[in-house]
Amino acid sequence: QMIVHLGSLFRHNLRTKRQQITLEEELDGLEDYIYLQQMRFDGRITVEKSIRVQPAAVLVPSFMLQPVVENAYSHGLKSREEGGRILLRAWMQDNVLVLTVADNGKGMTAEELDAVQTKIAQSEQTGRSIGLGNISRRIGMLYPGGKMQIYSRAGHGTVVRFELPQTQQPEEKE
């Protein structure tokens, strides 16, 4: 089963050439990644989803969610012996797709959060990428008025929030 999911994740990564894909496609690729992490962490970390949009009807930057979920596992939850939780939510607010990825991990102090946001801003300007900087830069290019915001509190977890104005319709699949 693990090999099947790993192969599927590789295929998703290799065949996705477009800058924007449907949320449905993004979630499909994310499922394989989550499965592999569930095996790695022996099910200690639960992932819940609350998707209140038609995933095939909205566009997101390709490879937007996996780095955020990866950060939740790697930085927020990995060291928690009692396990943890990641909650992925999506909804429409006016004509804006709002997505949040929240974890109940170790969180960050105000100083740590400030350092992360500084790194993101620097990577946006230089083009030298850290994962979140790459995502933020692509949101700025693809979604005028789009945003990525990070909220965190030490001992309580982190939330990454995306706001993506939906001005285009997904193309029909061939």
Set out the residue ranges of the language-model regions.
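Two-component histidine phosphotransfer core
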Residues: 1-149, 159-161
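C-terminal end segment of the histidine kinase catalytic
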Residues: 148-174
